[in-house]
């Protein structure tokens, strides 16, 4: 047995960026071209995932066809965003909803799927239309995905974006988009999508390369070993010379096919810089994207994803990982036995120098959680960075999950919604419609398997009766985030509903992939509590036309508030005001900020809240205030929505009004650094600009107003250099 104990990496002489300035954020197609920047901090970027979920917390539909409002029977709005940004992902159930309206900066582009022509006889070789700007492998349709239409083409917008469905039968969908703080260091300007320009071949070629070795050559170390039945075996220790650091660019293992099942539950552990706990600690199979290495139908690729793959060839099974994994001093790679000795294990690792400042990147983490008995009525917590690896603040990005959702080929677990929370938000900034939707499928994948560059259902029999043995009953899926990754600057809480309403008794296992550096890049600096006399006075709050403070008892948007007669999410009280004119207040900020995020808690019973936001300097003794426009703050929809889900493919649009008991919501607005940097306080003015849109044509208008319960200021800052 040959084990490499240490490898010295030659240090580079200088770095190519400044540690005091945020790294460049890859935008649009650059997010694919610059995939080697997966570990980089996204300071000033925020991700949001919206969907057609049941607003009452249940599983009506299931989670299909809930719309913000209807402009016409063939224009059912499901996403409405103000400001510049990029839509990075959209998922639909089969062709349902097509034709879709992609309204970019006021221009209505019609996007179709070829099954639209006759949805009762769907086209098996369906594609997105227009095909040139929406090509495979940035898009996939239901025959390949086994139930979903998926779109990863970046859709840029400079002022606004709306998405609407023309048809509402089974209109399930979720969508991921990014906003950027004005003045953020972007790799290219955001340009409005024109529905004509085709993605460049380099991006398509990258995604077509899924399943192959996509990493640069680098420095290679390799070896051969036997994994003991018990205990932990060090595979390699990589050492970096200061002040450079290194990046693991490829990590592979292979065993004879006869040892594949035994390898499934061997634990991979990787510790960066001799930290007290490993940042990667997960069963090998699940880490590489599959719940088991059982290959039910003898496929070459069990997993053919971009960052990982599992390939059966040459009488061996090969596992490869190409996530870039930075370290600053050392990387220790170990394997822990799982009850059976495994011989003839071959491994390789490739690495290169870290060519950027250390506080520009984060460690790679794969956090494993075992959920043998999910808690009744509560979401499973796949990751809470406040408690993992010593807890505290972390700054980084959430980049995916690999998860087992049943050990018994039970597929009803797939009704569970993903909900993700970032940087103290009480509202999920990401709310999905179901578990197989998150994994890139639809309708439980029809019980079939599939593997794509960024999503897949690699293993599991269609049913327990059809399983060839117990290994074949293990159902798993994966979802990786590249262009659509989700940044956080302080903490991340990644949750998944089990079953349709947190009632499942199935055994789940999850691996959550994320990049994170200890420390914060989003820092709270102040809070104004509306209705609190002392807080209003301290923040010079002024809103002459605002209502008197009023009490609200309600909830945030989570799962069912009651299950089996027991309350799961109790209501709570808070105090707020509403105004139909303007409010002003002062908030403290850090002078070294790179922009400020305002977070507002609001009463979501008031629909389509929109305001122009102005910023001024705080100057003692001066009566002159010079306001500068920071942008438009818009929160589309309300706790009332439209549900339209006719039974027939071409059924008439319905106008069912659904009102939830969830009136609390946290919402965010980004202020550019040119208005905030170098200041220790800013004066904020929000001027209400009403948006009068009925839930559907002819429905009475609901009273509109700007709701304020609290305002919090968070500053974007550079994270500290690693110790």
Please annotate each region the language model reported.
Residues 20-551, 573, 580, 602:
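Beta-strand-centric surfaces of beta-sandwich/beta-rich domains
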Residues 16-23, 723:
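Basic/polar N-terminal segments that are highly enriched at the extreme N-terminus
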Residues 12-13, 291, 618-621:
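Intrinsically disordered, low-complexity segments enriched in Ser/Pro/Gly/Ala and basic residues
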Residues 555-556, 721:
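Intrinsically disordered, low-complexity polar segments enriched in Ser/Thr/Pro and acidic
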Residues 5-14:
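Bacterial N-terminal signal peptides
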Residues 120-158, 301-305, 309-320, 326, ...:
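Beta-strand-rich ligand-recognition modules
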């Amino acid at each position: 047995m040959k084990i490499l104990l240490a490898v010295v990496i030659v240090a580079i002489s200088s770095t190519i960026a400044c540690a005091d300035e945020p790294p460049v954020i890859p935008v649009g197609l650059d997010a694919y071209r610059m995939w080697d920047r997966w570990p980089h901090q996204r300071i000033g970027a925020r991700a949001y995932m919206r969907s057609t979920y049941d607003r009452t917390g249940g599983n009506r539909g299931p989670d299909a066809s809930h719309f913000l409002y209807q402009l016409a029977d063939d224009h059912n709005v499901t996403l409405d965003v103000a400001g510049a940004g990029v839509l990075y992902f959209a998922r639909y159930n089969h062709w349902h909803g097509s034709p879709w309206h992609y309204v970019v900066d006021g221009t209505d582009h019609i996007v179709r799927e070829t099954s639209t022509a006759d949805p009762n006889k769907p086209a098996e070789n369906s594609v997105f239309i227009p095909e040139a700007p929406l090509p495979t492998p940035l898009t996939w349709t239901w025959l390949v995905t086994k139930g979903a239409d998926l779109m990863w083409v970046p859709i840029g917008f400079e002022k606004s974006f709306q998405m609407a469905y023309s048809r509402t039968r089974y209109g399930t969908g979720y969508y991921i988009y990014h906003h950027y703080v004005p003045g953020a260091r972007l790799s290219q300007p955001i340009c409005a999508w024109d529905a004509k320009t085709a993605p460049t071949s380099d991006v398509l070629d990258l995604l077509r390369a899924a399943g192959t070795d996509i990493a640069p050559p680098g420095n290679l170390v390799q070896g051969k070993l036997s994994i003991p039945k018990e205990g932990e075996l060090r595979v390699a220790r990589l050492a970096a010379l200061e002040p450079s650091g290194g990046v693991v660019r490829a990590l592979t293992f292979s065993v004879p096919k006869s040892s594949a099942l035994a390898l499934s539950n061997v634990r991979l552990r990787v510790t960066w810089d001799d930290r007290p706990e490993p940042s990667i600690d997960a069963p090998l199979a699940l880490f590489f994207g599959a719940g088991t290495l059982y290959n039910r139908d003898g496929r070459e690729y069990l997993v053919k994803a971009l960052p990982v793959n599992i390939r059966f060839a040459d009488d061996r099974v090969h596992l490869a990982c190409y996530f870039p994994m930075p370290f600053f001093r050392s990387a220790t790679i170990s394997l822990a036995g799982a009850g059976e000795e495994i011989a003839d294990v071959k491994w390789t690792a490739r690495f290169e120098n870290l060519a950027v400042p250390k506080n520009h990147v984060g460690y790679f983490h794969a956090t494993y959680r075992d959920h043998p008995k999910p808690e009744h009525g509560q979401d499973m917590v796949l990751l809470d960075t406040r408690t993992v690896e010593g807890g505290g603040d972390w700054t980084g990005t959430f980049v995916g999950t690999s998860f087992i959702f049943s050990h018994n080929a039970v597929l009803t677990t797939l009704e569970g919604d993903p909900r993700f929370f970032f940087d103290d938000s009480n509202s999920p900034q990401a709310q999905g419609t179901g578990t197989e939707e998150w994994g890139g499928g639809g309708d439980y994948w029809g019980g079939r398997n599939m593997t794509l560059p960024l999503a897949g259902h690699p293993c599991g029999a269609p049913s327990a009766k059809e399983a060839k043995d117990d290994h074949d009953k293990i159902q798993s899926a994966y979802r990786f985030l590249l262009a659509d990754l989700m940044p956080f600057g302080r903490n991340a809480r990644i949750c998944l509903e089990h079953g349709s309403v947190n009632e499942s008794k199935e055994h789940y296992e999850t691996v959550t992939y994320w990049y994170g550096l200890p420390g914060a890049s989003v820092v709270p600096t102040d809070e104004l509590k509306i209705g609190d006399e002392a807080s209003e006075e301290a923040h010079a709050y002024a809103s002459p036309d605002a209502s008197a403070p009023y009490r609200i008892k309600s909830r945030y948007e989570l799962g069912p508030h009651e299950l089996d007669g027991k309350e799961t999410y109790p209501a709570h009280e808070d105090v707020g005001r509403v105004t139909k004119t303007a409010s002003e207040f002062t908030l403290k900020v850090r002078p070294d900020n790179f922009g400020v995020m305002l977070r507002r808690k609001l009463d979501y019973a008031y629909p389509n809240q929109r305001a122009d936001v102005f910023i001024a300097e705080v100057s003692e003794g001066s009566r002159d205030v010079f306001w500068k426009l920071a942008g438009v703050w818009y929160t589309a929809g309300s706790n009332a929505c439209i549900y339209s889900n006719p039974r027939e493919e071409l059924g008439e649009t319905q106008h069912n009004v659904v009102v939830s008991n969830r009136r609390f919501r946290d919402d965010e607005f980004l202020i550019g650094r040119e208005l905030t940097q170098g200041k220790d306080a800013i004066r904020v003015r929000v001027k209400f600009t009403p948006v009068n849109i009925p839930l559907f044509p002819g429905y009475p208008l609901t009273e509109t107003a700007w709701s304020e319960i609290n305002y919090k200021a968070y500053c974007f800052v550079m994270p500290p250099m690693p110790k």
